[in-house]
């Protein structure tokens, strides 16, 4: 946030929400370049930093003043040169610049909210693991949950229109629309595997997609928080009203504005909970399956009428929490009864009472994880470790460090698993794969290599927490056993490792 402060002050001194001139400022591209050098593991660098220079930026800006030079025909191949450089390089530079500019209103809003609430910077609130304590607190009291896959917008124009609420500058939106139209196929379906979500343009399109999801959630949660009288109203009334307004081509915003009190009758549920990460969300409720089905068909109609996105009801699955597990953030979670026996004594009579309580059970998904390890050649599909041949040319310390880092990341992320036996199996696969890789490099057998190296190699795979507890307590102590059985949620995990994100 510190890197934005100077530009935010400059932006505040100018006309409100007037972002268009910033696209012609060199410092915007310099800022995008600096952020590219320090980007997270989810936004890998693909060569932009190696090829960019201040001279290229100046030439690009001078040509952008002339529309004929700025517009590049889609009929040209990707290898056609623009000012002597690859077209993809300029596409990436402009998209990075757009991302920085469009982020300015959001950064201003965040800074002002922090100043008003006097909130101290807390990265714990952004941790992925912070979702699971919420599950532990709320979900044991709920009965049904819906797995909702948020559909991608079918047209790029929908992504641009979602920015109009926070970016009041029409020129910026028109320029963004022109850029998207010229560099990408306007009528292409947007999916994560398409080129439009390539790593070179990920920051811009993640921003556009998050704006789209933010608008969807803002309307959904507003209706949830302000609603009344659900059980007095039939769901068919709402659907017929939506279809009527759709036929006469009224915007859905006017539907909510003109007939808002009647619409809200549909949504009342004081026990509903909503959680989302990326494109997957969970809607859980304590009420009956009828209510969950109403929410299901409302979401389908809402996407169709407001975002013009076709979504099938089959994409939303409703399950009973006590009988089905739900897959979220790499964990298989379920609600299980935890029965404790309490002995009570009344005068001379004593009796036993079974006290049943529900608790959240989070399991390590062993089968998908073995599939992920097999995909990157750490083991075969049955889970038998194999050598990583592509790493055999690296130094011994490099090979060990890579395996230890992967094992540490998995142990760190899956520390909240209720049963860690499956996690230990994955760590065993990584250890043996590491030994086989080293043995292959030195043209030796695994047994001979282990005898020569000793047990110190395997000690590298213990996590920092395991090493500390091993020093403080003997292996047979009850404290260490509770550590291995207990769940630990970390509030410093901001992204998911590629091996973890196996969905």
Swiss-Prot record:
Keywords recorded for this protein, A-Z: Chloroplast, mRNA processing, Plastid, RNA-binding, tRNA processing
Molecular functions (GO terms): RNA binding
Coiled coil: none
Disulfide bonds: none
Pfam families noted in UniProt: Intron_maturas2 (PF01348), MatK_N (PF01824)
Principal place of residence: plastid
GO biological process: mRNA processing; RNA splicing; tRNA processing
A cellular component term, taken from the record's GO annotations: chloroplast
Subcellular location: Plastid, Chloroplast
InterPro entries, sorted: Domain_X, Maturase_MatK, Maturase_MatK_N
Function: Usually encoded in the trnK tRNA gene intron. Probably assists in splicing its own and other chloroplast group II introns.
Protein family per UniProt: Belongs to the intron maturase 2 family. MatK subfamily.
Protein name per the record: Maturase K
Gene: matK
